Amino acid sequence: MAKLWFKFQRYFRRKPVRFFTFLALYLTAGSLVFLHSGFVGQPAVSGNQANPAAAGGPAEGAELSFLGDMHLGRGFRDTGEASSIARRYGPWFKGKDGNERAKLGDYGGAWSRALKGRVVREKEEERAKYIGCYLDDTQSRALRGVSFFDYKKMTIFRCQDNCAERGYLYGGLEFGAECYCGHKIQATNVSEAECDMECKGERGSVCGGANRLSVYRLQLAQESARRYGSAVFRGCFRRPDNLSLALPVTAAMLNMSVDKCVDFCTEKEYPLAALAGTACHCGFPTTRFPLHDREDEQLCAQKCSAEEFESCGTPSYFIVYQTQVQDNRCMDRRFLPGKSKQLIALASFPGAGNTWARHLIELATGFYTGSYYFDGSLYNKGFKGERDHWRSGRTICIKTHESGQKEIEAFDAAILLIRNPYKALMAEFNRKYGGHIGFAAHAHWKGKEWPEFVRNYAPWWATHTLDWLKFGKKVLVVHFEDLKQDLFVQLGRMVSLLGVAVREDRLLCVESQKDGNFKRSGLRKLEYDPYTADMQKTISAYIKMVDAALKGRNLTGVPDDYYPR
C-alpha cells in the first residue's frame, strides 16, 4: 500500500498539470452533489406546516433563533401561493419533525434556507407594489397619515407592515429612515434617480431620498381593507357654534354606526370623527372645537340606527372619536434660523419625564431641542438636536440633569420639571436597566441594585430641585403631574418662556398626539410596592424639604399625591 501511494505521488510530481486538473474535477463534482442535495432536499410545506395552529402548534422552544423577531403583520393579504412556501418570518418555521429533517440532507438545510429567503422576498413584493418616487414637503406631505422614524433600523418591509397594520393603502419612505402612511398620494412623481438613499436597516435597498418618497401600494387583507386601527373615544361635546367652520366635512348616514363615521373621516384624512345622530362630521381640534369642555355622556346617549349597543349622539350633542389619522399641523420641526441669544435649560431629575417634555416642546414650537449629553438612541428616534453641541444655539432648549452651581449658572433661564419622587425613581431605575421605554428585570428589583439605587438617588431628587431654585436665574417650575392633567395650559406656559408665540391650534394638535413614541407602556407594573418603610420615611422627608422650598418662593407646593403613600 505504501509503495502504491509513493508511485501515486511521484506520478503527479512529474505531471503537475494533470494533478491540478484532477483536483478541479474533484471539487466540481463535490459542488454538483452539494447543489443537487439542496434542490432535492427542499420539502413542500404541507397544510399543517403552513398553519401550525391547525396542527396543534409546534413544540415549545422549537423556533429557530436565527430568524429574529420580526413577524408578518396581519395587515398584508395572504396570497394563495403563500401556503406552498415557508416564510422567513412568523410561526411557519417552528419545529420540524425527524422525517422532514432527514429529507434536507446534511447540507440541504443551509442551501434551502437561502433559496427560501429569495422566494419569500419575491412573494412579499407581490403584497406591496412599488408605485414610484414622489416629491415630499414638510409643509405639504405626499402621504398624510401616521408616520414614524428609525434612523438605525428602518427597512422597506417594516414600513409596509406598519402602514398595512393600520389599514393604509400606501406606505412611503424617505431619508433612508422615515416612514409615512396614507390613503392617497397628494404629490407629483419625480425621476427615479432622485430616490437614492439606502435604507438604514437594509443595505442595498432604496428608502427614498432627500424630500423624496419611495411609495408602495399595499395589498391589504380583506378583513383589514376597511380597518383603520382603534379609534379613541374623546367624549360627549356640545355642538359648536359655527359647525361648517369647526367641522368642515359632513355626510348623512341613515344606517349610522361608529365604524362607518370613523371610516369615513379616516378616508377623508381627518383626525376627528363626530357623530350627530344620522350625520357624521369630520375635522380637526381647533379653538372653535377644542374638546376641553366635556358634557355628561347621557346627553349623547342616542342609539345608532345600525348598532343598537352604540351611541351616535344627537344634533345638539356630538359623540367624538379620534381616528388614526395623524394631525400634521404640528409635525414640522427644524433648527432655529439663527443662533439663539440665550440658553434655556429643560432641567429635571432623571426619570421625571424630560424626554416626553422634549417631544411636546418640539411639536408645540416647531423647533428641535438639544441636550447637555448625547444619546444615540434618542437621535435615531428623531431628536435631531441631540447631536448638536449644547452651546450651538440652534435648539430651542437644552435637556440637562445637572445640578451643580457652575452648570446651572451657565443657563440664562430654565424650565424645571419636577415629578413625584416615588414615580421618578422607579422610572429612572427602569431606564437604567431596561432602556428609555423598557423595564428592569424582576431580579434587579429583588436584588441589591434597587436598595442601593434608592439610597444614592433619593437625596439627589431633593438637592436637584433645591439647587435649581437657589442658583437658577429665571426658573419656571412645572410639575409633571400638572402637565399630564392640563397639557394645554402647562405647555402654553413652557412655550411662552421659550420666547415663541403660542399658537392655540398647534397646542391642540399636540394634545391629540401627546404620547409620541417616548412613553413607557403602563401595561406592565410591579405586583408589589418596592419601597420599604425605611425608604418611604426617608423620601417623605425629602418631599417636605422641596415643598417648603417651593412655598418659600411663593410657588405652588408639591401636588397632594406625593404623600402620604
Swiss-Prot record:
Stretches assigned to the Cytoplasmic side: 1-18
Membrane topology: Single-pass type II membrane protein
Segments crossing the lipid bilayer: 19-41
Pfam family, one: WSC
GO cellular component: Golgi membrane
Location of this chain's protein in the cell: Golgi apparatus membrane
Record topological domains on the Extracellular side: 42-565
Record's keyword terms, sorted: Glycoprotein, Golgi apparatus, Membrane, Repeat, Signal-anchor, Transmembrane, Transmembrane helix
Residues with attached carbohydrate: N189, N242
InterPro entries from the UniProt entry: P-loop_NTPase, Sialate-O-sulfotransferase, WSC_carb-bd
Domain WSC: 127-219, 230-324
Record has Membrane as a keyword: yes
MF-aspect GO terms: sulfotransferase activity
Keyword Transmembrane helix on entry: yes
Major localization class: Golgi
Highest taxon above the source species: Eukaryota
PANTHER family assigned: SIALATE:O-SULFOTRANSFERASE 2, WSCD FAMILY MEMBER CG9164
Assigned protein family: Belongs to the WSCD family.
Function: Sialate:O-sulfotransferase which catalyzes 8-O-sulfation at the Sia-glycan level using 3'-phosphoadenosine 5'-phosphosulfate (PAPS) as a donor, forming 8-O-sulfated Sia (Sia8S)-glycans. Displays selectivity toward glycoproteins such as TF/transferrin.
Protein's name according to its UniProt entry: Sialate:O-sulfotransferase 2
